[in-house]
C-alpha cells in the first residue's frame, strides 16, 4: 500500500510540474474554478537595501516587524518610520542587542511572530542563533550543540524598543563546523520559521543541521516541529512523549509553516534533497520520513555520517535515483506523513509559505503560496518564483500548481499575509515586496 501511495504521489508531482503553463492559460481564459474571477496581480517594492531580510510580522495598524539575518530586528511603523530594535553582536544602530546572538551560513536572526494577543500583552517572539547555551558542547559536528533559541520580548507602545527578553526554547541544535557536503558550512539546515496556530500555541520549525541521527532521534531538538505555549512548554496533547514539545519529527529543513483557513490544518514547506522539496499536512506524532543516517536502509558509510546528498553528492544525477538512495519521505516508516506535493525535478529551494486570504484573491483564495528560491543544479533551470498550490481537502495531494505572475524573479525567502489581504515577500537580494490582488 505504501509503495502504491508513493508511486501516485511522485506521478502527481510530475504531472503538476509539466502542467504549470497549461493551468495558467486555462485559468486566464475560463475564469478558473466555478466561474470565480482570476485576480489581477501587482507588486511593488516597499523596502530595499536590506541585508538578507528573512521574516516579517504585522500589527493590526500595518506596522511591519522584520528580521535581517546578520543584523537584527527592526520595525517599519504604519507612518513609514523605521526603528532598529534589537541587534546581534557587532550590529550597529540598534536600540539594544544580544551579544550572544550571531549569524553564520543559513543561521542567524530568522523567524519573528507576534503574540495573538499582541495588542494587550505586547509580546513578540524571535528565533536566533546563540552561543549562550553551548556549555561544554559544540566542539564537533557529532555532538549536542544547543545553538538556536526562541526568545520572547515585550514591545513598548510607540514601537521604539523591546525589553524583558526571556529565552523560552534553549536547545535547538546548530551545526558548528564545515562538513564534506554541498552547502556544508556552519549553520546549515537551521530551520527558523515560526507561526501561531489557531489554538494559540506557537509552532517552531527546525532543521537537521547536517547530522545524520537528528531527524529520527527524539532526544535531540533538530528535524522536528515544536508546538509550545508562550513559556516554551509543550502542548499537553502532543503525542511524542520523548519530548512533550514535539508535534512531528523526521524533517530535513522546515522553512514554512501555515494553517489552512478552512479547517486550521497545519502545513509545512520544506527543503528536500536536490529536487524533492515537499509540502506536507502535519499529523500529531507523525514522521516526515527523512532519515539521512549512514548504514541504514541498505546504505553504506557516507561523508561525515550524513547521506543526505548521496549517492553522488557533488554532481547532478537523475533525481529519481538520488531519491531512491535517501528518500525525503521514506516509506519504511509506518508513521510516515505523505507529502501533498513534491518539487520533483523542477529546480529547488522551497522557502516560506502562506495561505492566501481575502476575496480579492478570487480563485486563489485559500490556496497556499510558496516561495521557490530556485537553486539550479545538474542542468535544471533556476526557476525563482512564487507558486500557488491548490491542495486537496484531504491534504494528501494537490489539484494544481501555477506560477504567481509577480513580474520579478527573486530568491523569495519569506512570505507573510499583511494588511489589506496583501502578500508580503522578502528576498535574499534585500527587498520586501507587497503583492496585491484585485
Residue ranges and their predicted role:
Residues 65-89, 383:
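Beta-propeller domains
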Residues 29-36, 93-103, 107-109, 117-119, ...:
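Beta-propeller domain segments
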Residues 414-438:
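Blade-level signature of beta-propeller repeat domains, shared across WD40, Kelch, NHL, RCC1
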Residues 45-51, 87, 102-104, 169-171, ...:
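Surface loop/turn motifs at the tips and blade-to-blade linkers of beta-strand repeat domains
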Residues 10-19:
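Bacterial N-terminal signal peptides
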Amino acid at each position: 500500500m505504501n509503495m502504491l501511495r508513493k508511486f501516485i504521489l511522485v506521478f502527481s508531482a510530475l504531472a503538476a510540474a509539466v502542467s504549470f503553463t497549461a493551468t495558467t492559460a486555462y485559468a486566464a481564459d475560463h475564469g478558473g474554478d466555478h466561474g470565480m474571477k482570476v485576480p489581477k496581480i501587482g507588486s511593488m517594492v516597499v523596502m530595499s537595501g536590506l541585508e538578507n531580510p528573512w521574516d516579517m510580522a504585522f500589527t493590526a495598524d500595518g506596522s511591519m516587524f522584520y528580521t535581517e539575518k546578520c543584523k537584527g530586528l527592526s520595525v517599519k511603523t504604519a507612518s513609514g518610520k523605521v526603528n532598529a530594535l534589537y541587534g546581534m553582536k557587532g550590529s550597529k544602530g540598534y536600540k539594544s542587542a544580544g551579544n550572544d546572538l550571531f549569524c553564520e551560513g543559513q543561521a542567524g536572526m530568522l523567524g519573528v511572530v507576534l503574540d495573538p494577543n499582541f495588542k494587550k500583552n505586547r509580546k513578540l517572539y524571535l528565533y536566533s542563533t546563540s552561543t549562550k547555551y553551548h556549555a561544554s558542547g559544540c566542539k564537533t559536528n557529532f555532538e549536542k550543540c544547543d545553538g538556536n533559541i526562541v526568545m520572547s520580548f515585550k514591545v513598548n507602545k510607540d514601537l521604539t524598543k523591546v525589553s524583558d527578553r526571556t529565552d523560552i526554547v534553549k536547545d535547538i541544535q546548530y551545526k558548528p563546523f564545515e562538513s564534506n557536503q554541498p552547502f556544508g558550512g556552519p549553520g546549515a539546515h537551521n530551520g527558523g520559521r515560526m507561526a501561531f496556530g489557531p489554538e494559540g500555541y506557537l509552532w517552531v520549525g527546525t532543521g537537521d543541521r547536517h547530522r545524520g541521527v537528528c531527524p529520527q532521534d527524539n532526544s535531540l531538538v533538530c528535524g522536528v516541529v515544536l508546538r509550545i505555549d508562550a513559556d516554551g512548554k509543550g502542548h499537553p496533547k502532543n503525542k511524542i512523549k520523548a519530548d512533550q514539545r514535539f508535534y512531528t519529527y523526521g524533517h530535513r529543513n522546515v522553512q514554512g509553516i501555515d494553517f489552512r483557513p478552512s479547517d486550521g490544518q497545519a502545513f509545512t514547506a520544506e527543503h528536500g534533497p536536490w529536487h524533492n522539496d515537499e509540502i506536507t499536512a502535519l499529523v500529531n506524532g507523525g514522521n516526515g520520513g527523512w532519515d539521512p543516517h549512514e548504514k541504514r536502509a541498505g546504505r553504506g558509510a557516507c561523508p561525515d555520517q550524513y547521506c543526505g546528498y548521496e549517492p553522488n553528492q557533488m554532481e547532478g544525477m537523475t533525481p529519481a535515483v538520488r531519491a531512491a538512495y535517501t528518500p525525503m519521505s521514506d516509506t519504511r516508516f509506518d508513521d510516515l506523513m505523505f507529502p501533498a506535493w513534491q518539487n520533483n525535478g523542477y529546480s529547488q529551494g522551497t522557502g516560506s509559505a502562506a495561505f492566501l486570504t481575502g476575496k480579492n484573491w478570487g480563485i486563489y483564495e485559500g490556496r497556499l503560496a510558496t516561495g521557490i528560491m530556485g537553486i539550479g543544479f545538474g542542468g535544471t533551470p533556476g526557476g525563482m518564483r512564487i507558486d500557488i498550490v491548490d491542495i486537496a481537502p484531504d491534504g494528501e495531494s494537490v489539484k494544481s500548481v501555477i506560477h504567481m505572475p509577480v513580474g520579478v524573479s527573486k530568491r523569495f525567502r519569506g512570505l507573510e499575509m499583511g494588511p489589506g489581504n496583501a502578500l508580503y515577500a522578502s528576498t535574499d537580494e534585500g527587498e520586501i515586496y507587497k503583492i496585491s490582488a484585485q
